[in-house]
Amino acid sequence: YHMDHLGQLTAALPEIPLYMGMLSKEVAMISAEYQDKNLYLRLLGANTFRGGEAFTIGDIRIRPLVIDHSAADSYMFVIEAEGKRVLYTGDFRRHGLRHHVLDKLVNTYIGEVDVLITEGTSLSRDAGDYISEATVLDDISSYIQDGKYVFVMCSSTNIDRIMGIWQNMPIDKVLICDAYQKRILDTVINNVYYESSLY
């Protein structure tokens, strides 16, 4: 549901079918309801899937696998057709709160593939250049503990970060968000179906 994946969707021919994770569709529709009526209408007809449950389009078998990313309900896809196996990684991270999922996916569900298609946003970054999500949350928790008022600015769809802040909130502090943010959080909490210690 990040706009780098949805931003041009309304320019696609309407007869082209759209497939999304169930939770991604719900969150994207909330965002589109506030920002883009045409995108909202396009999302209404989207087909949905769940992680681990393969589906077919014609002779192509697609198995979505839930992966760690700042957007909850992000997927890698194992695509099988004409005797070949392709892994499309989508966006993923190894520094998030569910980073351990990647090795399990590769060893248990993916195995060997004929073709790897991956995004290259961080390929040139040195391994030591990133800060883990756990470190970010620890730093935020320290500021919250020490400060009277702390304002956290992040994407309203960075669910892991927001839920991590909420779970680490000192007992004498309160997390306040607007109605839009609460609606997104409630949607995630009520619709997530995979393992997460956050929601």
Positions of PLM-derived features:
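Short, electropositive alpha-helical surface patch
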Residues: 137-140, 169-176
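Composition- and surface-driven signal marking solvent-exposed, interaction-prone regions
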Residues: 164-168, 179-180
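Residues at alpha-helix termini
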Residues: 35, 171-172, 191
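Short hydrophobic beta-strand segments
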Residues: 149-154, 173-179
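A contiguous, basic/glycine-rich beta-loop/short-helix subdomain that forms a polymer-engagement track
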Residues: 180-199
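Beta-strand->loop->alpha-helix junctions that form or flank phosphate-binding loops
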Residues: 46-50, 175, 181
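His/Asp/Glu-rich metal-coordinating catalytic cores
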Residues: 4-160, 164
